[in-house]
């Protein structure tokens, strides 16, 4: 079974407050997927340290770069379609109201005062609908990421060929994601890493249902 993952962690923004946790959170997820999930992982923004790739703490990522990477992940044209495609994003989320409220994943080049907010979650939903990848996993660790949970999982253009989609978000659309004081990771990423730990269930395969149940319980304790 082939598994591909795009892992994004953005600390650095031109017009928004810089963040501390996303790059470290993303790198921890990337290593976990590589070492325990047998995923082929792409990191953004990518830095090379000691001849190895890692999520860059001070690097920028533009909207076109993120869009190209997502299209390559979910609609690959020059390589075999993976059985599973996973997208993890940690960074700022934006809800912008220009007569119609819409949610965005903020890339480093966003400027909300000028109406430029980053990757539209509606665009992402449409990409997932059109994707031939059978198992699609999206983990969003940002404020307002709950906007994506309005996604209509039924794909009317592909009846009879169901998709297995799993969405895990750090917050509801009206809430702000937060970091747990004294922890090396955000609340959601800490729960993800805990749920993916093979030592927790040594005799059981960790699938989406098992992981989601663990995260729901972990977040309930934190609230």
Where are these regions (language model features)?
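Short glycine/proline-enriched loop/turn "hinge" motifs that connect secondary-structure elements
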Residues: 1, 34-35, 95-99, 158-161
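Short glycine-rich His-centered loop
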Residues: 1-18
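Caspase-like (clan CD) cysteine peptidase catalytic core
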Residues: 2, 58-151, 184, 203-204, ...
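Short, conserved active-site loop motifs that form the nucleotide-linked donor/cofactor pocket
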Residues: 3, 39, 165
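Active-site-proximal beta-strand/loop segments in catalytic clefts of secreted hydrolases
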Residues: 8-11, 44-48, 88-92, 108, ...
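Active-site-proximal C-terminal subdomain of hydrolase catalytic domains
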Residues: 9, 19, 26, 117-118, ...
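Second-shell loop/turn segments in exported
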Residues: 15-20, 55-58, 113
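Functional beta-strand-loop-alpha-helix junction segments that form "active/interaction loops"
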Residues: 26, 31-83
């Amino acid at each position: 079974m082939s598994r591909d993952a795009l892992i994004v962690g953005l600390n650095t923004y031109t017009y928004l407050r810089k963040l501390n946790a996303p790059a470290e959170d993303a790198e921890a997820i990337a290593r976990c997927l590589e070492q325990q999930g047998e995923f082929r992982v792409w990191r953004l923004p990518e830095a090379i340290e000691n001849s190895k790739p890692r999520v860059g703490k001070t690097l920028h990522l533009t909207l076109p770069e993120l869009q190209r990477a997502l299209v390559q992940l979910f609609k690959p044209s020059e390589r075999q379609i993976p059985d599973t495609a996973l997208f993890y994003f940690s960074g700022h989320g934006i809800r912008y109201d220009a007569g119609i409220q819409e949610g965005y994943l903020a890339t480093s080049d966003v400027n909300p005062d000028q109406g430029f907010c980053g990757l539209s979650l509606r665009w992402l939903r449409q990409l997932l609908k059109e994707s031939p990848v059978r198992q699609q996993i999206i983990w969003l660790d940002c404020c307002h990421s709950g906007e994506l949970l309005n996604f209509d999982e039924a794909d009317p253009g592909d009846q009879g060929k169901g998709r297995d989609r799993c969405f895990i978000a750090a917050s509801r659309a009206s809430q702000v994601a937060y970091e747990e004081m004294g922890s090396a990771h955000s609340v959601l990423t800490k729960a993800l890493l805990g749920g993916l730990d093979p030592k927790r269930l040594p005799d059981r395969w960790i699938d989406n249902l098992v992981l989601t149940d663990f995260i729901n319980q972990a977040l309930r304790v934190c609230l």
